[in-house]
UniProtKB/Swiss-Prot annotation:
It holds the Pfam family Trp_dioxygenase. Disulfide bonds: none annotated. Coiled coil: none annotated. GO terms for biological process: L-tryptophan catabolic process to acetyl-CoA; L-tryptophan catabolic process to kynurenine. This is Tryptophan 2,3-dioxygenase-like protein. It comes from Xanthomonas campestris pv. campestris (strain 8004). Transmembrane segments: none annotated.
Length: 270
C-alpha cells in the first residue's frame, strides 16, 4: 500500500486514534510509567479521557486501564524497592552506603581528570577550559544523583531510600564479575533491553507514520508524528539509564572490602 492509497480511506478512521490503545497503556502502567511523565495529548485531555466513550461515559477499555492502575505496585516500584535493600559491600547501613558512594565519586573524578588530560592534547586554552567545565559539571551531576541531592522536595527518608537504590545499581554494574552479583546484573540488563525494545518500536512506529502521512494532524487530533517523536523520549527506568553514564572501566573502580563474601559458597569445604 502506498501513502496515497492510505489517504483514500484514512478519514474513515476518525476520530479513532492511537490514544485509544488500551493494551499499550496497560503495559506502560504495569512497567511503571508515571502520569507525570506523560506528554499531553492536547485539548486539556489525559490519556484516560481518550479511552472513554463519546460524552465521557467509561468504556470497557477505560475500565481495564483504571483497574490496572489501581492494581498494586508497578514492576518499577518493586524493582527499586528490592534494589534499596541490596547490601552494598556487605552492608545496608546508610553510613557504609555513603562511604561506598563517596569512594566511587572520588574514582570518577580521578578518571575524569585523566580523560581531560588525554583530550587536552592539541587543544587551545579556551577549548581546554570549556572541556574542564564540562567534566566539572559531570562530576557535580554525578554527586547530586548518587547522593540523591537532585530533588530538593524529597524528604530525608526518600533521599536515603533513593541513595541506597542508586548505590545498588552502581554496585551491581561495577562488580558484576562477582558470582553472587551475576544474576542481579542479568536482571538489570534484561530490564534495559526491554525498555530499549519499546523505544525502538516507538521510533519505528513514528517513522512509519511519517512515511505515510508526513506531518499531518492525527486522526484523533494530536500533532501526529511530533507527538510520537516526543513519546520516544520516555524513560521508565531513568535511574538505570543514568547509571550507565557513571560506569568506570574495571581498573578504575574502587576496591571493596568484602569481595570474598560475594563468591561461591561450598558447604563442607574450609
Amino acid at each position: 500500500m502506498t501513502a496515497r492509497d492510505f489517504l483514500e480511506f484514512r478519514e474513515r478512521l476518525a476520530p479513532a486514534s492511537g490514544f485509544q490503545s488500551a493494551q499499550l497503556r496497560e503495559i506502560e502502567i504495569l512497567l511503571g510509567l508515571e502520569d507525570t511523565q506523560r506528554i499531553s495529548i492536547g485539548n486539556g485531555c489525559s490519556y484516560r479521557d481518550a479511552l472513554k466513550l463519546p460524552g465521557g461515559a467509561p468504556s470497557s477499555s477505560a475500565q481495564r486501564v483504571e483497574a490496572r492502575a489501581a492494581d498494586g505496585p508497578s514492576f518499577k516500584h518493586c524493582l527499586y524497592d528490592w534494589l534499596s535493600r541490596v547490601p552494598i559491600d556487605g552492608s545496608n547501613a546508610p553510613a557504609d552506603i555513603t562511604r561506598f558512594l563517596e569512594a566511587y565519586l572520588a574514582s570518577l573524578r580521578a578518571e575524569n581528570d585523566r580523560r581531560l588530560k588525554l583530550a587536552s592534547s592539541g587543544l587551545a586554552a579556551a577549548e581546554i577550559e570549556q572541556l574542564r567545565a564540562r567534566y566539572a559539571a559531570e562530576d557535580a551531576g554525578a554527586q547530586a544523583f548518587l547522593l540523591a541531592e537532585d530533588d530538593p522536595q524529597a524528604s530525608d527518608a526518600e533521599r536515603e531510600t533513593r541513595r541506597a537504590g542508586r548505590a545498588a545499581m552502581l554496585f551491581i554494574e561495577s562488580y558484576r564479575e562477582l558470582p553472587q552479583l551475576a544474576w542481579p546484573h542479568a536482571l538489570l540488563e534484561s530490564v534495559l533491553e526491554l525498555e530499549q525494545a519499546m523505544l525502538i518500536w516507538r521510533q519505528r512506529h513514528a517513522r512509519m507514520v511519517e512515511r505515510f502521512i508526513g506531518r499531518r494532524i492525527g486522526t484523533g487530533g494530536s500533532s501526529g508524528v511530533d507527538y510520537l517523536d516526543q513519546t520516544a523520549r520516555y524513560r521508565i527506568f531513568t535511574e538505570l539509564w543514568t547509571v550507565r553514564s557513571l560506569l568506570l572501566r574495571k581498573a578504575a573502580v574502587p576496591q571493596i572490602r568484602s569481595s570474598a563474601g560475594y563468591g561461591f559458597v561450598m558447604e563442607g569445604f574450609a
